[in-house]
Amino acid sequence: MSSSVEYRIVTTWERKEDIETRSKTNRQDKNSLYVRTFEVEGNLWFVSSDITRHFNSLIPINECWNSISDHMMTIHTTTAGHFFEKVVDYYGLCALINFEEDPKRKELLEFVNNIHTNNLINVATPELVKVYMTDEEKKVFI
């Protein structure tokens, strides 16, 4: 990967049982979802591991928080001329995928796959967890 690109994980959350499942099988089952937010050279990216659509899809986001309810949020953003609508709940991110090539997409996928392969789980908390979870729900997450 290019050393000129800086990556910083902003937030991550997963269900404990998903981490245990993945460490045993080295795969994600269809119910195993997580979301990460990355800051790459000042731009925010969401990453999803919903294997029923595509493994570790990356979607850039720009001021795209449209609606927030107690446990759900819809995100709208446009990338490479494509419109995306994503629903986030406290189980993670389900994303529609843009399969078009992007110069940084390959680097980002390699970076995320490296994190996944080596089980380098950076768990953050802050705002996203605070928005989506009750105290009881937080107990099933790391």
List PLM regions with ranges.
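Positively charged, aromatic-accented nucleic-acid-binding surfaces
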Residues: 1-58, 79-142
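Major-groove recognition helix of helix-turn-helix-like DNA-binding domains
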Residues: 61-71
